[in-house]
Regions:
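Transmembrane-helix motifs of polytopic, lipid-linked glycan transferases
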Residues: 163, 167-188
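Sec/Tat-exported extracytoplasmic proteins
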Residues: 9, 133-136, 157
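Transmembrane helix-loop junction
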Residues: 131, 156, 185-186
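Extracytoplasmic catalytic/substrate-binding loops of multi-pass membrane glycan-assembly enzymes
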Residues: 94-108, 114-126, 138-150, 160-163
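Conserved hydrophobic/aromatic pocket- or pore-lining residues that grip, position, or stack substrates
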Residues: 129, 150, 184
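Aromatic, loop-rich ligand-recognition surfaces of beta-strand-rich domains
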Residues: 1-39, 46-114
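Regular secondary-structure segments
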Residues: 126-134
Length: 189
C-alpha cells in the first residue's frame, strides 16, 4: 500500500533551447486493481526545483497514475512510500520514458532535509548555475553571474546534487580566511 508520492522537480531546456522548462503540476490517481482509479488531486505547480516534495495520497493503493497537466512538467525522480515511511520500495513504471522516473530509487530520502534538497536561496542559485551549464537564459539575474559560474564548477565536478552546488562556496569561504588574515594584518600592522 502506497501512502505518499515523493518526487523531485527538475528542469530541462525548452523546445528552442533558450530557457528552462520547469513544472510539477500533475494529476495523481491511485488504484487497488489497476482498473478503477481514485482521484487523489493535483500536485502544486509552485514546487521548488531540486527539493524533494511529498504528496499525501488520499486513497492508498497498489498502483499510482501520474498525468502531466501541462507540457512544462519536469520530474527528475519519483517514488512511492508506504504510509509508515520506513523504507523506499522498488517500483515499476510503465509508459514512454517512465523508467527514468524510478531508476534511482536508492537516492530517494525518507524525509526532506538540507542534506538532500535545495533550501533558502539555493532554489535560485543552484538552479541558475545549472542553467549556465546548460547554456540557458538564467532564471535569477539580479546578482552578477560570477558566483553562479563558480557554483557551476562544483556541479560540473561533483554532479547536480547538494554537495556539488555547495562545494565551491565552502572552498572559497575557507580560502578567503588566510587572505582576510593577511589583509587585516597589513592594515593594522
Amino acid at each position: 500500500e502506497c501512502g505518499y508520492l515523493y518526487f523531485l522537480p527538475g528542469l530541462a531546456p525548452d523546445k528552442n533551447h533558450y530557457a528552462a522548462q520547469v513544472g510539477s503540476k500533475m494529476k495523481v490517481e491511485s488504484s487497488e486493481d489497476g482498473v478503477s482509479w481514485y482521484d487523489c488531486g493535483e500536485t502544486n505547480e509552485k514546487s521548488h526545483v531540486f527539493a524533494w516534495q511529498a504528496y499525501n495520497l488520499e486513497h492508498q493503493g497498489k498502483y499510482v497514475r501520474l498525468t502531466a497537466l501541462n507540457e512544462k512538467v519536469t520530474i527528475s525522480e519519483a517514488a512511492l512510500l508506504p504510509a509508515a515511511k520506513d523504507k523506499v520500495p522498488d517500483i515499476k513504471a510503465e509508459g514512454p520514458g517512465a523508467e527514468y522516473l524510478v531508476d534511482e530509487h536508492e537516492t530517494v530520502p525518507l524525509y526532506k532535509t538540507y542534506m538532500n534538497s535545495s533550501y533558502f536561496d539555493e532554489i535560485y542559485h543552484a538552479r541558475t548555475a545549472y542553467e549556465h551549464i546548460l547554456e540557458l537564459e538564467p532564471y535569477e539575474n539580479t546578482h552578477p553571474p560570477l558566483g553562479k559560474h563558480i557554483i557551476s564548477l562544483g556541479i560540473r565536478i561533483f554532479g547536480m546534487n547538494p554537495f556539488g552546488w555547495r562545494f565551491m562556496g565552502t572552498l572559497f569561504g575557507v580560502l578567503m580566511l588566510p587572505a582576510l588574515y593577511h589583509f587585516i594584518k597589513n592594515l593594522f600592522g
